[in-house]
Amino acid sequence: MALGRAFSVAVRGLDGEIVEIEADITSGLPGVHLVGLPDAALQESRDRVRAAVTNCGNSWPMARLTLALSPATLPKMGSVYDIALAAAVLSAQQKKPWERLENTLLLGELSLDGRVRPVRGVLPAVLAAKRDGWPAVVVPADNLPEASLVDGIDVRGVRTLGQLQSWLRGSTGLAGRITTADTTPESAADLADVVGQSQARFAVEVAAAGAHHLMLTVPPGVGKTMLAQRLPGLLPSLSGSESLEVTAIHSVAGLLSGDTPLITRPPFVAPHHSSSVAALVGGGSGMARPGAVSRAHRGVLFLDECAEISLSALEALRTPLEDGEIRLARRDGVACYPARFQLVLAANPCPCAPADPQDCICAAATKRRYLGKLSGPLLDRVDLRVQMHRLRAGAFSAADGESTSQVRQRVALAREAAAQRWRPHGFRTNAEVSGPLLRRKFRPSSAAMLPLRTALDRGLLSIRGVDRTLRVAWSLADLAGRTSPGIDEVAAALSFRQTGARR
């Protein structure tokens, strides 16, 4: 009997778990038996591994071969285990085990000729290896820039199975850590490109300062998409931990760029209005993959033509909006992805959507039904609502508005003021602050609260609406350089909440 052993990583969501792979060669009829809850792609690895091993000049054991992946109760999915399976088989045929194999995690898919192909989810796998104290990890050479983002662990890139064998024997080396640029190219979109729309521009600035959700109700062609695309440019760059978290999500989704693997700027995700629930919040067969809400984590999720999106997809947004994460239950377990994003909704005021509102042919009931798809609980979570109007000819002769860099400076100062205020309480932005904290310890003066009390008495606001209005008021105060909101900030925040879409 001969036994070989190698190690790999199973990724579920953004978490990784170490998988031990054992290859046992015993007397009996030749055959390969794979155990440990493998999926279809992993079952097919038997043929890939056998062809790769023999095509690299090695012999395949002419006996009964059992490949066991532990823990046995953990579902194993994908082709990431190929090179670990091959290494375990080759180790079982050696008279002396490879020492490096006991201290190295192996990730990668094999082609039939022994080339190592790139796989998804390398970054969360390497992070899991570092967390569990592994000294080294070998990844496909094409994934090496991504793996090199993790410090404190030895990462190596391999191109062929033969190259891996030579390294395990100690006869040759493998490519080491790659230093890549740590910046994402700045977007060429500038806020100065937007003509007119001063109220909507200011709403975007307030949204950036406090991380608030925003809704734009506007006729077609007025500039709602331009405004939404320029919101990420006003947001601060991601911190080191945020960059790794966002990059890990895009790694699992298979969307990383080989040139700039580290995402340092807030992402902008704009799914089509016909997207399904699974495309929006995540899902799919086998391992649940991140949806648009997770890909927009720490960035902006733009839903254009939101009144055309299915009701089930819209209602699925309520949980990530409230919790900042999405949990996807599948037969084999639950995958959890972070989903803390800024939501920007955009809708036409009616189905016919004429350029001039006077040309509208929709009945009043039709208009109510059109925007009525946006439920009260969903709209209640949107802090800023703006009704945009078509431009007049004079708007094109007016002076250009402020640029993105100018507005970004004010946003940065406002965010810094908010961060210093909320840091002792565990918050960073105004939109994250809990309602009880706002109402008890940071309650504005009695005079400043007058507009809110009036709206609450008239039934125009819910308690959650009061909390969200106070958050916007704090953002307005931060932009104005005030230490607390006054009656003007509270009234302005309330006006942002009471304009826009009407249900």
Curated annotation (Swiss-Prot):
It comes from Mycobacterium tuberculosis (strain CDC 1551 / Oshkosh). Coiled coil: none annotated. One of its GO terms (molecular function) is ATP hydrolysis activity. This is Uncharacterized protein MT2965. InterPro entries: AAA+_ATPase, CHLI-like, Mg_chelat-rel, Mg_chelat-rel_C, Mg_chelatse_chII-like_cat_dom, P-loop_NTPase, Ribosomal_Su5_D2-typ_SF, Ribsml_uS5_D2-typ_fold_subgr. SUPFAM superfamilies: P-loop containing nucleoside triphosphate hydrolases, Ribosomal protein S5 domain 2-like. It comes from the Bacteria. Belongs to the Mg-chelatase subunits D/I family. ComM subfamily. It holds the Pfam family ChlI.
